[in-house]
């Protein structure tokens, strides 16, 4: 195992996200935002689709995705963007209200995470993720 390689790919992912967020020097925030959005997305997708997505993420990012995951739990019935944003805030304790202060900032952050994820997965996998999302979240995923 080449842990340096895994760390480098994870750092690149976080650096890309920090750039997308417009705060290239704030990698701590990028990490928090990534973790919160990944957990909210994970809790919305089926376990099977989560496994497919997980297989394409960099190793260090996989760790964020699976942290605290309970496979016995069924996917959340999140239907709207507002519900998704609330789920994201819930996973960014205690900074959720700061990192996702209002709907506009939250949408910007979620789209930034979605853009970076989509750059690191195949087009087919991006379509598979999109297919599992409700209409409003599909639009958010497509716009990213």
What feature does the model see in each segment?
Residues 24-36, 42-51, 100-112, 116-131:
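Short, low-complexity cationic-aromatic patches
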């Amino acid at each position: 195992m080449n842990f340096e390689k895994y760390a480098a790919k994870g750092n690149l992912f976080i650096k890309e996200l920090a750039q997308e967020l417009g705060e290239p020097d704030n990698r701590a925030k990028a990490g928090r935002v990534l973790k919160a959005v990944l957990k909210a997305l994970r809790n919305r997708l089926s376990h099977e689709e989560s496994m497919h997505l997980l297989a394409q993420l960099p190793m260090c990012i996989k760790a964020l995705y699976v942290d605290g995951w309970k496979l016995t739990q069924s996917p959340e019935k999140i239907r709207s963007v507002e519900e998704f944003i609330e789920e994201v805030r819930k996973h960014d304790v205690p900074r959720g209200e700061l990192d996702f202060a209002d709907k506009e900032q939250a949408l910007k952050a979620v789209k930034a995470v979605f853009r970076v994820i989509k750059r690191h997965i195949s087009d087919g996998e991006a379509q598979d993720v999109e297919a599992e999302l409700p209409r409003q979240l599909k639009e958010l995923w497509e716009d990213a």
